[in-house]
Structures are given as structure tokens and as C-alpha cells.
Regions:
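Alpha-helical catalytic/interaction cores of small GTPase-regulatory modules
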Residues: 1-198
Length: 198
């Protein structure tokens, strides 16, 4: 927690941090029909314990029979992990470029330019964004039960994956809508942005 994404991802063969895969796999196993998945928060004490286990490099038991049986603990820890990254999954330079592309006229939205911007991300950032995008699409496929469609997931993950502007928080607060839009566009156009052959 709080350490560089590239450093953590580099020890994994697919360049996606272990914690991201561990948490999302458990969500896909038993959390897809949980109403408000990723929107509801887990208990703080258990979150702190789980963060401590991951921070030591250990492999926690996330099964339903274990200490972290509440799926909201796992989803909250994953969101916290993304929030604490020193450089967000979508770093400031890519965020600036995507903001220019997204705030252009809707009918002129150039998905290939957005793809080009995302393609330029460092490999661990690219692979992690691709991985979490695929996961969130799977979650949205259960939206009739979990009530988390693409828009709702983008509201949760926009500020989480894009991070914050600590130098000027009021500007960052006003840009939350843009972050949500960026994640919405990525989720809605995932097959174009992340073709399987890359």
C-alpha cells in the first residue's frame, strides 16, 4: 500500500499487482449479485487488518469461511489500494490528454485517439487498467441484481483510478464529473481500447 504500481506489478508475470487479482477474483467468485457492490463500505477494523496482511506481502484467505467473509471489506480494500498509489493508474499526463479528448463535442468523441493515449501508458499501468476494466464490465453484466451499471461503477472508480490533484483540491473536486466520464467511456468502448491481441 502506498508504493509504486510499477514496482509491485513487475514481480507478476502479467504486470498486474497481486492484490488487484486476489480481490477481483474473490468478487467474481461470490460478490457479483451483491447489491451496491463497490459502493458500500466494509468495516474499518477488518479493512485495516486486511491492508496489513497485504502490506506484509502475505496471501490472505479471502474465502467466505475466513475472517474477511464480508465482500465489502475486500472491495473497500481494493479501492483504498488504488487511492493510495503514489501515481494513479491513469497518471496526470494521461488524465490531461484524456480530459481534452473527453470534453470535446460528444459526436466528435474519437475513441481511437483515446486508445492511443491509453496505449502510451507504462506497461503496468496499461495492464492494470485493462484488467480492472474487464472486471468492472463483468460486474456491470449483473447490474439487474447488483444495481451497479457502467455509470454507477464509473462514479465509484473515476476518482479512484485517476487520483487526485493535491496541489489544488478545489480544481480536482470540480473535475470529478470528467473523471467519471473518462471511466464511462473506457468501459463502454473496452473492446476497441483493449483489443485481445495486445
Amino acid at each position: 500500500f502506498g508504493t509504486d504500481l510499477s514496482k509491485q506489478a513487475s514481480i507478476e508475470p502479467d504486470n498486474v499487482p497481486f492484490i488487484v487479482k486476489k480481490c477481483t477474483n474473490e468478487v467474481e467468485k461470490r460478490g457479483m449479485d451483491f447489491e451496491g457492490i463497490y459502493r458500500k463500505s466494509g468495516r474499518t477494523l477488518l479493512m485495516k487488518i486486511l491492508i496489513g496482511i497485504f502490506s506484509k506481502g502475505d496471501d490472505p484467505d479471502l474465502s467466505e469461511e475466513g475472517e474477511f467473509s464480508e465482500i465489502t471489506i475486500i472491495t473497500s480494500v481494493l479501492k483504498q489500494y488504488f487511492r493510495e498509489l503514489p501515481v494513479a493508474v491513469i497518471p496526470p499526463d494521461a488524465y490531461s490528454k484524456l480530459t481534452e479528448l473527453i470534453t470535446a463535442d460528444e459526436k466528435d468523441l474519437n475513441i481511437l485517439e483515446i486508445k492511443k493515449c491509453i496505449d502510451s501508458l507504462e506497461i503496468s499501468h496499461y495492464n492494470t487498467l485493462k484488467y480492472i476494466t474487464r472486471h468492472l464490465i463483468k460486474v456491470s453484466e449483473y447490474s439487474s441484481v447488483n444495481l451497479m451499471n457502467i455509470k454507477n461503477l464509473a462514479v465509484v472508480f473515476g476518482p479512484t483510478l485517476i487520483g487526485s490533484n493535491e496541489i489544488c483540491p478545489e480544481v480536482d473536486f470540480s473535475s470529478t464529473g470528467i473523471k467519471v466520464k473518462i471511466i464511462s467511456v473506457i468501459l463502454e468502448n473496452a473492446d476497441t481500447i483493449f483489443p485481445d491481441d495486445k
